[in-house]
Design a protein with these regions (language model features):
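Charge-dense, intrinsically disordered terminal/linker segments
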Residues: 1-139
């Protein structure tokens, strides 16, 4: 269903983020603008351990809700961070650049997924101020 990730230069940890996103496509968080969110990637500075002072990108969409507190996110994902599940970068700029690339991949996934869902739905007339389907108005 989705594009193959090979050849895109992703690390195994970045692929884990795309997999997390793909798992949540069927149940995204809908933000205030009505847009679906599947991961809410959040960069946090690692406060302890071998990667202390480096930056990790973790999902902020957890358990059907958005978590923005960095300390809370670190506690939620601590074991996964320490085990190397999520990508770690030397600087926040490196993290932001890679997340921007991953976001492009995820945006393509989302567009493809929702287009497929739209095609599965029965025909529904879209409302328009300028057009009305004449076949639906005949009585």
């Amino acid at each position: 269903m989705f594009a193959d990730l090979q050849g895109l230069g992703l690390t195994p940890q970045e692929i884990n983020k795309v997999a997390y996103h793909r798992q949540n496509l069927g149940n995204p968080f809908i933000n205030q603008e009505g847009k679906p969110m599947t991961i809410y990637a959040t960069g946090i500075e690692i406060p302890e351990g071998k990667n202390k002072g480096k930056f990790v990108s973790v999902p902020g969409y957890v358990g059907g809700r958005i978590v923005t507190d960095e300390d809370q996110l670190y506690n939620i994902w601590k074991k996964d961070i320490q085990s190397g599940k999520w990508p770690v970068y030397e600087t926040a700029d490196q993290l932001n650049a890679r997340d921007a690339w991953l976001h492009q991949i995820m945006d393509k996934d989302m567009a493809q997924y929702f287009e497929q869902q739209r095609l599965k739905q029965p025909y529904q007339q879209m409302e328009s101020l300028f057009y009305q389907d004449p076949f639906l108005t005949i009585k």
